[in-house]
A protein has these predicted regions:
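Conserved acetyl-CoA-binding loop-helix of GNAT-fold acetyltransferases
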Residues: 96, 102-115, 135-139
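A short beta-loop-alpha structural element at the N-terminal edge
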Residues: 4-19
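Conserved acyl-donor/pantetheine-binding loop and adjacent beta-alpha core of acyl/acetyltransferases
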Residues: 66-93, 101, 152
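Conserved acetyl-CoA-binding loop of GNAT-fold acetyltransferases
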Residues: 138-147
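Conserved GNAT-fold acetyl-CoA-binding loop/helix
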Residues: 22-46
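Conserved GNAT acetyl-CoA-binding A-motif
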Residues: 110, 116-128
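Conserved beta-hairpin
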Residues: 52-70
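Conserved beta-strand-loop-alpha-helix junction that forms the acyl-donor binding cleft
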Residues: 101, 123-134, 150-153
Length: 165
C-alpha cells in the first residue's frame, strides 16, 4: 500500500464521494447524530464540485476521506448567525470513512486546507452535540465565534485566523 495522498476530486470521484459521505452519515446516525442524513446525493456532490474545491484523501485508488473548501457560506449561516463576521473561506463536508477515523486523516485534510488559505480567514460550523468534533476544531486552532440554531440543530460557528496562532 502507498501512503495516502490528497488531490482535487474529479467527476469520476462522484459515486465514491456519495458513498463515503453517506457511510459517514449513517455512522453518525448510529451515534445519535442525524444532521447529515439525506444531505448528500449525486446532485449535491456534483454541485459541490462546481462551486468548491473538493479534496479527496486517496490510498491507491480508494477514497478514504474528503473535504470541501469554498468562498460562499452555507445558506443557513445568515439565519443562524446574522451578526457573525464574514470569512474569506468556508470549510464543509470534512469526512473520513469510519474504519479510518481516529488515525489522523481528518487532521491531514484540515491542515491541507489551512495551508491553502495562507493568512485568510476560514469558518466552519459544527453541531453542539458532537463534543469530540468540537474539541478537534479547538485543538486545531479554531475559535468559537458564534452559536445558534441552524437546520434544526444547535450549532457553533468556528473561525481560524492564522495570526491568532
Amino acid at each position: 500500500m502507498t501512503d495516502p495522498k490528497i488531490q482535487l476530486a474529479c467527476w469520476q470521484d462522484v459515486d465514491a464521494l456519495v458513498s463515503l459521505l453517506n457511510t459517514c452519515a449513517n455512522h453518525m446516525h448510529q451515534q445519535g447524530m442525524s444532521h447529515w442524513l439525506d444531505v448528500y446525493n449525486e446532485q449535491s456532490v456534483r454541485q459541490n464540485l462546481l462551486q468548491k474545491s473538493v479534496y479527496v484523501l486517496k490510498q491507491d485508488s480508494m477514497i478514504m476521506g474528503c473535504v470541501a473548501l469554498g468562498i460562499q457560506q452555507a445558506d443557513y449561516y445568515e439565519d443562524c448567525w446574522p451578526l457573525a463576521p464574514v470569512a474569506d473561506f468556508y470549510l464543509t463536508q470534512l469526512a473520513v470513512l469510519p474504519e479510518y477515523q481516529q488515525a489522523g486523516y481528518g487532521r491531514i485534510l484540515l491542515q491541507h486546507c489551512l495551508g491553502l488559505i495562507g493568512q485568510h480567514t476560514l469558518q466552519l460550523d459544527a453541531v453542539a452535540h458532537y463534543p469530540e468534533l468540537l474539541n478537534f476544531y479547538r485543538k486545531s486552532g479554531f475559535k468559537q465565534v458564534a452559536q445558534g440554531i441552524g437546520l434544526g440543530d444547535h450549532r457553533y460557528l468556528f473561525e481560524y485566523r492564522a495570526s491568532a496562532q
